UniProtKB/Swiss-Prot annotation:
MF terms (GO), sorted A to Z: structural constituent of eye lens
Role, per record: Crystallins are the dominant structural components of the vertebrate eye lens.
Gene3D superfamilies assigned to the protein according to its UniProt record, in alphabetical order: Crystallins
Free-text comment on this protein's domains from its UniProt entry: Has a two-domain beta-structure, folded into four very similar Greek key motifs.
Source organism of the structure: Chiloscyllium indicum (Slender bamboo shark)
Protein name per Swiss-Prot or TrEMBL: Gamma-crystallin M1
Top-rank lineage group of the source organism: Eukaryota
Assembly and oligomerization: Monomer.
Keywords: Eye lens protein, Repeat
Length: 175
């Protein structure tokens, strides 16, 4: 179980809120968050309530200016704890939504689905084992999305409209 402390102002100033589990709407506890400390574990922060929209991955460390770190002053409204470790990792990725197009299966990190599988993009996936981060661009760059075991039939339904993913990485003991 992880632990994160949010602060209303930069440099760990102002009111604080301590969190050790998922929170679907952090605005219930504080009006804004401009810095945080991850004392243990890993967390994914989401731009909108109920784990929707743009995401940002946080591991153990201090984040003294969240707005500067996240693109264009993005604020976040919900947070999810990334539970680990998993010994097995397995995911099926599909080129199109709802099981469409080419399907490939992976059990390890993939820095480019174009190079490895000759797939133009990934728009649907089924995570059988482990927790993963999917990235918008090859070589683990760009916007990201956190996935835990389950079926993800349409990234659009998760508030990621127009997103396509080109690389994916397992969440192991990197937290």
């Amino acid at each position: 179980m992880g632990k994160i402390i949010f602060y209303e102002d930069r440099n760990f100033q102002g009111r604080s809120y301590e969190c050790m589990s998922d929170c679907s709407d952090i605005t219930t506890y504080m009006s804004r968050c401009q810095s945080c400390r991850v004392e243990s574990g890993c967390f994914m922060v989401y731009e909108r309530p109920n784990f929707m929209g743009m995401q940002f991955f946080l591991r153990r460390g201090e984040y003294h200016d969240m707005q500067r770190m996240m693109s264009m002053g993005m604020m976040f409204d919900s947070i999810r704890s990334c539970r680990y470790p998993y010994r097995a990792f397995r995911m099926r990725i599909y080129e199109r939504e709802y099981f469409g197009g080419q399907m490939s299966e992976l059990m390890g990190d993939c820095d480019s689905i174009m190079d490895r599988f000759r797939m133009s993009d990934c728009m649907y996936c089924h995570v059988m084992d482990g927790h993963w981060l999917m990235y918008e661009q090859a070589h683990y760059r760009g916007k990201m999305m956190y996935l835990r075991p389950g079926e993800y039939r349409s990234f659009r339904d998760m508030g990621m409209s127009g997103m396509r993913f080109m690389s994916m990485r397992r969440i192991t003991d990197m937290c």
